[in-house]
């Protein structure tokens, strides 16, 4: 099923947004997310401690694991031991996880965020240009993903320095309930292979007209914009990021093969560059996915659900139909459109 043929979700977003920002049942909150730190990685510990303090995470939701942080990929066996330890320490009410490192970002053929969410499962992998198992959380109205669906969506607070991590966390906290008036930039590029999401852009404009400023543009990059709230593009490298100002809570990603290889030189831009430029959330695949749109964020879902008051981790996870090969990075609890009474 193509994105634009998902009539059920289109009607849900259209009518929900008719009241602008309706009061949904509570989004995932600080009591329902567990922070996972690697005690053998000093930066991970620093990030985890700062995040727990800023978000007032309950002490029982602070989970410690112990493994060498030297590599980009965990073996299935290594991950199995880590996951068993995490499961043992996870409180029953926890609905989501926040990782506190940029590497490792992969478990064999899965991204590390999907491996923590689903458990390692080769059905979420693919050899060649093939689809993978779909996520039951895609387009879901579930408010308690573990209780209702048996999965804990996971996002990495990814950074290569504490200063970068601190700035990211602060942006997420600052975004809460800010109801920003930024712009959604939807770029159609000359890279036909990576421009496959552009078919959904007219639908974004049609649904969100009058509720958010949407700017569709035929260009290979965006420059000198000071109100970036969403930025979706298909390119291996994205130029001009240093000229942009991202609104706190901003989501930005580029559809390409290896944007999720966060700390390695893959010949393509790492999704970390978005966070370093000021975005609060991004996404990239850790292994060749081919250009199946279902393996990348759907702009209609991502923008629509964010405007409905969902957190970044809920919004982004619900926007990817086949997330097995993709890593979600950012500040999980950022919620620019969540009214205070919705917490």
Identify the residue ranges that each predicted region occupies:
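Sec-dependent N-terminal signal peptides
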Residues: 9-18
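Cysteine-dependent hydrolase recognition
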Residues: 27-343
